[in-house]
Curated annotation (Swiss-Prot):
Disulfide bonds: none
UniProt source species: Flavobacterium johnsoniae (strain ATCC 17061 / DSM 2064 / JCM 8514 / BCRC 14874 / CCUG 350202 / NBRC 14942 / NCIMB 11054 / UW101)
Domain of life according to the entry: Bacteria
Family: Belongs to the class-I aminoacyl-tRNA synthetase family.
'KMSKS' region (motif): residue ranges: 729-733
EC number: 6.1.1.4
Protein name: Leucine--tRNA ligase
């Protein structure tokens, strides 16, 4: 009976689906375990072999926990709204709702091409997902709850004193009773102080404008990353090296009215929460740096001949007497107000130039020095000296106050700036305020082992004491105070795109109003033109039916807007991260129509025990999810402070690209081993044209592209064309994509699963090599032969031998430890060792092979199910307890001794470990092989170390 993976896998995948084998229960008496993968964007031509790596690892772990008696929730869904899905639709000339549906469910695309679909691809790999809980962020029954969460954010404010969010109605009560002078809230910087009587005298519109300065999500004009190519605003984490991560389009800075999330309110809690979760230190450090906590002082500088003041946040108030100039961010509001007429043209030109650079690019580029003098001067708070005010793009508007007091002697960037513009526009000589420190070559940035000098009342003090005294003196004269600052900025939450969640917002007198939650969802309307525009007009502006009737409480025709009972709806949509910032909670109760999840389901599942996904989400999804979770916890809707207890970032599976080499200026291709210094142009070629020996299929290559039809070739001495190989990212554009469908069709899903786990440590990057698949496939066939021969089942009821039990229990111990430690690759190695040992022992004992099938089950579930059924069991192997390790079977009773003569090993002999040296010597001396080696001689000395060596000398 031969191993037939295709037949076996189809059978068991059907069984699992029909019997809902992996359905989790919300009211189980078993302990819970929630295992989650980051859900995919259904945005392209399906999965390649790199995509399932994390899914396979989580599936192995989920199946293992079921064997251990846990009620396991292991769901899957699709992050189907947002830029990735929309860009794919644009590139293929289709509508995003159509491509999203086909990419998930399969079907025929616009050009008549059959698309397998993510769901079918995932099913073929044999995952233990609870598909009854599937979510799609673009389904109205899902984004209804995303809209509901947005409304909760809008109707909340953050109290600094209590460190949590509260309902906005409580803030209104405070305003009515005592005004806002004593309110400790996270709010806009420019809030006006008012009394209770003044509040009561304000109109409703005035009150709403004030409340917008406190709400957790708010509308404000902000400096944003605008991408004309994508026609939308991007978050900082969506930009790489000054271009959009998606599509590589240039990004510029621009002021726009946008919805923003007040994530900055949670900065300290986000920071402290990292101490309570089991995440890699590298991810934690990324978030710490992104949050960017710094302790220092807020210093106020008056501007000479102006009523304006410049506020500066500094971590070094001890260096206040070393200030020689000030630098504002080019986007700073004061720039236009204080720039002199003489400098106006130069300043405006500089601002236009820097608008083309992203904040990340400006932060990273420490070598380029640029700036312009504004013509204005600030006044030193203590010495009253005039300090020239410059603008420079190394200062960011969103960090701190967007202004720095430049102390060249203590900061490298200030030092470089001062030297670069030395002697220009009042740029002063660098002042040295550090005793016994040479700054002739570089700034002195250390805070340690230095004494402050040339600094009036700070002279002779160290960093700590000088900082405290400087803050005290600044507070005394009313020009500063101690302050903790965070680099983390509020997150822009608007996108000028079509394919996203509509905001549940309409406008009255230009002010946002929330649609009552009972009327959700507000469904994304159909529009004839959904493409983004370079001028930023959102596609929903083209919608014929996109206005809100407050009497009928429904969406009506846009041309009915009268601003009396029918009002315009918000034209922007939410960003891609909206739906992914809470999705793990929806899986807990996916069919609840009234709330995103019931209190009972939330109380049972709590949060995710194991989360697996890419490290590229460190400062995006993983931060936004923590923010939303903490907010929902504050409002009583989430049971825990953190969403994900343990996080593992799987490494990337890299492709092995194939290269052909064309002689420069010709259409002749030379085999890699015949290049010999000739000028060649390397060209990537489809890896499917190349066999495991790196030999190119000439016919397929010539038929691939028209310009290759007439190609000529210089072969090696064996008449073959050998390609070059290089390990690179797996990508369609590199022609090195291998799909799981191909592997499953040829070798089976169990082979794919085992091979991906066998490639190397889960968290490391590793190259894909299809040639290695055959070895894993051979292992499964060898496993099968322990149970079957050509005539059928050969499992017997023989008592297992000591060696049988030893092989099994070594494997039980190793596999259980490896899965708990996520060392999946070494488990596969142990399986191979075990099967080899049992094969050489000619073991067919049921007592060994039944537990072996269970051990293999998390990794290769289809073959394990078939073996289990063939052994006579009627239930799924997934319901069976994991084998228990018994140490007694690993106790060594015998030792295979190497027997040496004059230090050279000649043979081995197996003896009981409890023998004395004298007993060992007696047995060895009587052995025929010893007699043959000695040839009648008597050894001068017999060296025996029990349990280690036997050596006969002389």
């Amino acid at each position: 009976m031969k191993y037939n993976p295709n037949e076996i896998e189809a059978k068991w995948q059907k069984y699992w689906a029909e019997n809902q084998t992996f359905a989790a229960k919300n009211n189980s008496e078993k302990p819970k375990h929630y295992v989650l993968d980051m859900f995919p964007y259904p945005s392209g031509a399906g999965l390649h072999v790199g995509h399932p790596l994390g899914y396979i690892a989580s599936d192995v772990y989920s199946r293992f926990k079921r064997h251990q008696g846990f009620n396991v929730l292991h769901p899957m869904g699709y992050d189907s709204f947002g830029l990735p899905a929309e860009q794919y639709a644009i590139q293929t000339g289709q509508r995003p709702e159509d491509t999203t549906r086909v990419n998930i469910d399969g079907g025929v695309d616009k050009e008549g091409k059959q698309i397998a679909g993510y769901r079918k691809q995932l099913d073929k790999i044999g995952f233990s997902f609870d598909w009854a809980r599937e979510v799609r962020t673009s389904n109205p029954d899902y984004y209804k709850h995303t809209q509901w969460i947005f409304i909760q954010l809008f109707n909340s404010w953050y109290c600094r004193k209590q460190g949590k969010a509260f309902d906005i109605s409580e803030l209104v009560t405070v305003f009515e009773e005592s005004g806002n002078a004593l309110v400790e809230a996270v709010c806009d910087d420019n809030v006006t102080i008012f009394t209770a009587d003044e509040w009561k005298s304000y109109s409703d519109d005035q009150k709403e404008k004030i409340l917008l300065q406190y709400r957790m999500t708010y509308l404000a004009e902000t400096e944003v990353n605008w991408c004309p190519g994508l026609g939308t605003v991007l978050a900082n984490d969506e930009i790489v090296n000054g271009v959009s991560e998606r599509g590589g389009f240039p990004v510029i800075r621009k002021k726009m009215t946008q919805w923003s999330m007040r994530i900055s309110a949670y900065a300290e809690r986000l920071l402290q929460g990292l101490n309570d979760i089991d995440w890699s230190e590298s991810i934690k450090e990324s978030q710490r740096n992104w949050i960017g906590k710094s302790v220092g002082a807020l210093v106020t500088f008056n501007v000479k001949n102006h009523d304006e003041v410049i506020e500066v946040f500094t971590t070094r108030p001890d260096t206040i007497f070393g200030v020689t100039f000030m630098t504002l961010a080019p986007e700073h509001d004061l720039v236009a107000k204080i720039t002199t007429p003489e400098q106006k043209e130069a300043v405006e030109a500089y601002i236009e130039k820097t608008a083309k650079r992203s904040e990340r690019e400006r932060m990273a580029d420490v070598k380029t020095i640029s700036g312009v003098f504004t013509g204005a001067y600030a006044e030193h708070p203590f010495t009253k000296e005039a300090i020239p005010v410059w603008i420079g793009d190394y200062v960011l508007a969103g960090y701190g106050t967007g202004a720095v007091m430049a102390v060249p002697c203590g900061d490298e960037r200030d030092y470089a700036f001062a030297n670069f513009f030395k002697g220009q526009n009042g740029m002063q000589e660098i002042k040295n305020i550090f005793a016994n420190v040479d700054i002739s070559e570089a700034a002195y940035g250390s805070k340690d082992n230095v004494e402050i000098a040339a600094s009036d009342f700070l002279n002779g003090l160290n960093y700590k004491d000088a900082t405290a005294k400087a803050i005290y003196k600044l507070e005394e004269i009313g020009q500063g105070k101690g302050k903790t600052n965070y680099r983390l900025r509020d997150a822009v939450f608007s996108r000028q795109r079509y394919w996203g969640e509509p905001f549940p917002v309409y406008y009255v007198n230009g002010l946002p109003k929330m649609i009552d939650t009972q009327h959700l969802p507000i469904i994304l309307p159909e529009v004839e033109k959904y493409l983004p525009t370079e001028d930023g007009l959102p596609p929903l502006g083209n919608a014929a039916v996109w206005a809100w009737d407050i009497k009928e409480n429904k969406v009506v025709n846009t041309d009915l807007v009268d601003n009396v009972s029918i009002f315009p709806l918000e034209l922007n949509t939410m960003p891609g991260w909206a739906g992914s910032s809470w999705y793990w909670m929806r899986y807990m109760d996916a069919h609840n129509e009234n709330e995103f999840a019931s209190k009972e389901a939330l109380a049972y599942w709590e949060n995710v025990d194991l989360y697996i996904g890419g490290s590229e989400h460190a400062t995006g999804h993983l931060l936004y999810s923590r923010f939303w979770n903490k907010f929902l916890k504050d409002k009583g809707f989430a049971p825990t402070e953190e969403p994900f207890k343990k996080l593992i970032n799987q490494g990337m599976i890299l492709g092995t690209t194939a290269y052909v080499y064309r002689l420069e200026g010709t259409n002749t291709f030379v085999s890699k081993n015949k290049i010999k210094g000739q000028n060649v142009q390397p060209i990537r070629v489809d890896v499917h044209f190349v066999n495991s020996s790196d030999e190119l299929n000439i016919e397929k290559f010539k038929a691939w592209r028209e310009d290759f039809n007439t190609a000529e070739f210089i072969f090696d001495e064996n008449g073959k064309y050998i390609v070059g190989r290089e390990v690179e990212k797996m990508s369609k554009s590199y022609y090195n994509v291998v799909t799981p469908d191909d592997i499953c069709a040829e070798y089976g899903a169990d082979t794919l699963r085992l091979y991906e786990m066998f490639l190397g440590p889960l968290e490391q990057a590793k190259p894909w090599n299809t040639a290695g698949i055959s070895g894993v496939f051979g292992f499964l066939k060898k496993l099968w032969r322990l149970y079957f021969d050509d005539n059928g089942l050969i499992v017997n009821n023989d008592e297992p031998t000591k060696d049988n039990l030893k092989s099994l229990h070594k494997t039980i111990k190793k596999v259980a430890e490896d899965i708990e430690n996520f060392s999946f690759n070494t488990s596969v190695s142990q399986f191979m060792i075990c099967v080899n040992e049992l094969s050489s022992q000619n073991c067919h004992s049921r007592a060994i092979l039944e537990p072996l099938a269970i051990l293999v089950s998390p990794y290769a579930p289809h073959i394990a199910e078939e073996l289990w059924a063939q052994l006579g069991h009627k239930t799924s192997i997934s319901e069976v307890a994991f084998p228990v390790f018994d140490a007694k079977h690993l106790v060594e009773t015998n030792k295979e001794y190497p027997v040496s003569f004059n230090g050279k090993m000649r043979f081995t002999i197996e003896l009981p470990l409890d023998l004395t040296a004298a007993q060992i010597e007696e047995i060895v001396m009587k052995d025929e092989r010893t007699q043959k080696q000695l040839d009648g001689r008597i050894p001068n000395k017999v060296i025996i170390v029990p349990g280690k060596i036997i050596n006969l000398v002389g």
